[in-house]
Amino acid sequence: DNKDFSTDVRYVSTPQGIFAVGPNFRVHPTTARTQSETPIIRHPTNSNIMFASANTYNVGGTTTFSTACYKTTDGGVTWSGSDTTVFNFGDPAPMIMHTGRFLISYITSTGQMGASYSTDLGSTWSGVITFPGSTTSSDKNLSAVDGISTSTYYGRCYTVYTEFAGAYTNRIVSTY
């Protein structure tokens, strides 16, 4: 069963065959918060640098929902960061540009799609940049950077998301 936290490899039988599911682990060890939707990306020119993010929820005390940001500079041996970097509605989508700038898109505290960036490996973050045209019903974002150095759009960051209200109701919207 893939719903429970486990440190064991699990095997899932599907019509396509049997697949091994690696064990769960916390990117940033903590006992007071959950971590879900945890994408991890690697720096395009330094494979020892990785940037991860997660939805976090305080399971004791206050009911704070947040986006967490974690980084490693030693290939994943150790991680640092915060479970409460940006207070919002989650759905983190991390990116690292070829310049080393970290970016993360997420659902803002108003329900719109937005992003923040860091120029110091995630130690400090910009304020929220809200995407033009995003309504209070934005969801399901995915972000990426054009990493092809010969591309006309090299270094451009893209986010696609679903808009559930406004002029783009039930459409997938792209922004860069």
Question: Could you say what each language-model-derived stretch is?
Answer:
Residues 1-176:
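C-terminal PAP-associated
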